[in-house]
Amino acid sequence: VYFMTGTDEHGQKIEEKALAANKTPQAFVDEVAGVIRGLFDLMNTSYDKFIRTTDPYHELQVQKMFKKLYEQGDIYKSEYEGWYCTACESFYTETQLKDGACPDCGGPVHKAKEESYFFKLSNYADRLIKHIEEHPDFIQPESRKNEMINNFIKPGLQDLAVSRTSFKWGIPVDFDPKHVVYVWIDALSNYITGIGYDADGNHEERFKEFWPADLHLIGKDILRFHTIYWPIMLMALDIPLPKQVFGHPWLLVGEGKMSKSKGNVIYADDLVKLFGVDAVRYLMLHEMPFAQDGTLTYDIMVERINSDLANILGNLVNRTLAMTNKYNGGIVTNAKVSGEFDQELIDLALSTPKKVSDHMDRLRVQDSIDDIFDLLKRCNKYIDETAPWALAKDEANKDR
């Protein structure tokens, strides 16, 4: 297993925030990347590679890929005029706007006109649809696959702007340096540059070993970029596609998204101070369903910790250890003895690992956790049914 994560560090939004903070863009992203890595460490989250899109190797490969796509006719220079959302780093047509605002984040858009290089997405639309049809698990969950096909691919793909001239914080197009490579090629390509892809074919061993990736695990709000733009770019570069792209749902606060303006953002370090790392990790995994958005509030978190971790798991561990220390000197005198309640528990214990594994293979983490806690609840019930404290005093049933 090779697990890679990292930070997308270029773009107009970062350039503007760095200016507002009176810092250079590089100093600004260095600081932010440090904070993000600190959060991974805080949450005991391990990874094999933390890639930054300001890494020199990544920048060099992006320039080489851009030039290769241009030279083979997949990219051409033209001019773009439309509406631009800085927050989403995306262009939109008039008809795509929602009540005059960004259709994705609801934020403000402004009229933009600039020279740009464009990627001919439409040249690969039929090939992409064919790939999706022949690989039914390529986009998951199923509802998101249908959304991508029916809402974006089949209506027709517009050519994609892949360079910008209105800001400077980006990777320069080496043969036309007034342009910087836009996020679609810059950020998305980190998945292959991070494991040693080389546009000239001199790949590192890690790329040969780990690509194509078994899984891209991403937020549902960026699924379009990872299931349309990214696969088409790989097709154009003659690189195998990842085996699956999974768009996970959001964790909502109450019924709405977290928003700094609403003051409802829940921060990981605050949660760790309140509940501890392991409890927070459990909460994040359990409250994130497979397809629907999850809901997280402080009341839900307290209730979940009390009911699951304290009453079910904690109670089982406490009762088991206490009775082990109290009775028979902690020794099982006859492991083969059984009673009327044993077989049901044995069957459940034997079947649970496969159920957990099957659910994890399909990324149904919440269901896997529920499988485990079904077993824990049955163990607690077994203790109530068999009453070891009574058996220990009954000489005839002492082996039980």
Spans of model-derived segments:
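N-terminal, positively charged nucleic-acid-binding surface of large information/translation enzymes
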Residues: 1-139
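N-terminal alpha-helical segment
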Residues: 10, 264, 294, 348-352
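Helix-rich, typically C-terminal accessory recognition domains appended to large enzymatic cores
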Residues: 77, 300-338, 345-400
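Short, glycine- and charge-enriched coil/turn segments that flank and shape catalytic ligand pockets
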Residues: 99-100, 134-136, 176, 199-210, ...
